[in-house]
Amino acid sequence: MIILMTKIEKDTNNIITKLHERGGNDKAILAALRRSNSILSRQATVVWPMLFEYIKDKDTFGENSRQTISERAIFTALRCYAVFEQGNDSERDREYDNENANSLFRNLSFLRKDERLRDALDRRAQAVLSTTNIEAVTRSLVSLTKIIKANNSAAIINYPELANDLYNFQLGFESARKVAIKWGREYFWINDNRESNED
C-alpha cells in the first residue's frame, strides 16, 4: 500500500535528511533546536536557513512576523528529533528512513506495556489528549519524546507524521480533537502481534 506524504511531511523529511547528510555540521542546529522553545527564540535563528529553505510555498508564509502553523508544526517535530538524537552519534551514521518508524504515541504505547511506567505515562498522555492548546501540546510532546528516549533509545519515531499531526491540530477545535482521537487510538490500542522496535 502506497501512502502519499503531505507537503508538511515532505518538508520535515527533507530537513531531517539534510541534517543527516551534513554529518557533524548539524550539531549547532540540533543544539539550537533543543534550546529553543519556538521558532521565535533568538537561539532558533541558527535553524532558520534550513527551515525556510524547505518551507517555500507562498501560502505557508505569514503576512507578518507571526510564525505560521506550518512553521510551528515542523519546528516542533524537528525539536523532538533533536531531543531524541542528542548523544546518538551512531544513529546519524545510518541514512534517515521513516518507513519503519512508528508514531510518537505508538512508541509510547510500547512503553505503556510496562506496568511500572503505565500510570505516569497515562497521566501525561491524558494531559495532551484533553487539551486544544497548541503551546501545552508542543511542550508535552518534547517531554514525551524524552521519556521514549530514556526508556527505549532504539525507538524510531515518525517525525514527518508528527509534524503533519501538529499542522492539523492547529486548524481549529474540531481538527484538534480529530488529531487527539488519532493519538488516543495509537496510545491506548494494544496490538500484541505488532513488535516494538526494541524487540
Language-model features: where?
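Interaction-prone helical segments in low-complexity regions
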Residues: 1-7
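N-terminal domain-start signal
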Residues: 9-61, 65, 76, 93
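Intrinsically disordered or highly flexible coil/loop and linker segments, enriched in small
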Residues: 24-25, 39-46, 60, 87-91, ...
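Non-catalytic, well-ordered alpha-helical scaffold segments
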Residues: 27, 31, 45, 49, ...
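Aromatic- and glycine-enriched beta-alpha-beta binding-site module
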Residues: 56, 60-110
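Conserved binding-pocket/active-site segment within a compact domain
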Residues: 97-169
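Alpha-helical oligomerization segments
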Residues: 149-199
